[in-house]
């Protein structure tokens, strides 16, 4: 109700009494020429690779709403207050965002492959046309549960792969988790196994390794090409060249796997088999969606899983509770994991994942382009403005969470009703929330149950807190070194 009243207020005479947009505090750069210089290596105090630190600094200097001029004519309004975040994300129209601009340009240059720029960059009715069709197979709880057996089978294979990788010492988990999520993404999307755990596929020239590299390269190029002067619109900059080369390879694999699926008569329960049969989607829609799922499905869940295992390994009491829950769900490690158990019997596992995503979300926040004028923290913000939430910073503030830097899953079991629902939004919110959220969560739940059922996780990395690199999505900035010790029954 409050959100509705706030929205109405901006279209009424009350909007007149809001403080002007120009009065929002924040960095404008020397002579109003923009703050881009402050992100340049060796010159500025900020970094595109440390956006969370820049966000914390701006909050401390300017408060809960910040207007930053990147270059003249290109502003970002940053929001830290959950009331403002709720107002932004409870949209009535098709949500718009300003992201993946260079990816959109690459796809526009390939009209023989793509009819649209895909789910990630596209806005408006065309975005909704695609989203409405592809989300049926990805968002419905029943559809997601249909993948449990496949995911569980690959996860058990992954744990055997970890056993073979131990060699008596700690394992850097992130590269291993990336292979797991690549394998799961290709299996669920295309119904295809890449055999990513084999020695052959661990070769740097293999398809698996090249796909992993291409996904990370693409994601690392998004922020630098989205912001600033965008010279790539006029000439081939190094970042645009890297993105294009990476996307060209991912596109070739997506085309190959889609065609293979079609040749096989679209058999099985893969996502692409359903999309190929959908009369509302043509071949270019299917290929674009396949490329999007490859790009979005590999690194996001891998990085989130790496932070998750890091927190568990550093918190033995949490780990013991997880092990006990895993034993209740899987009395024997050889038992099948049931869909009913995942739905009703893993309360603590869910809390652990949520707490990890509070401290280390997939991204620093959620971006939107305003569809209408709005008021945030008493300031007028006009339609068309780029607004980005700062959930990662907000989730580490004492006014929102008691002892905010402590990893404490029990907070989600004991005081959940008192916690603002617009603070922890790792998958976004509303119509434009992550289309594969339920599937990603289910995959991570299965990984936790299987791994903690058999192994104790011992942290072998630095005693310092794990840092973050913001490659569009948040990545651990150091090896996630964990020693796996087989539990005795």
Curated annotation (Swiss-Prot):
The keyword Oxidoreductase applies. Pathway: Steroid biosynthesis; ecdysteroid biosynthesis. It catalyses: 2,22-dideoxyecdysone + 2 reduced [adrenodoxin] + O2 + 2 H(+) = 2-deoxyecdysone + 2 oxidized [adrenodoxin] + H2O. Heme binds at residue 434. Its cofactor is heme. Disulfide bonds: none annotated. This is Cytochrome P450 302a1, mitochondrial. The lineage of its organism: Eukaryota, Metazoa, Ecdysozoa, Arthropoda, Hexapoda. The gene is dib.
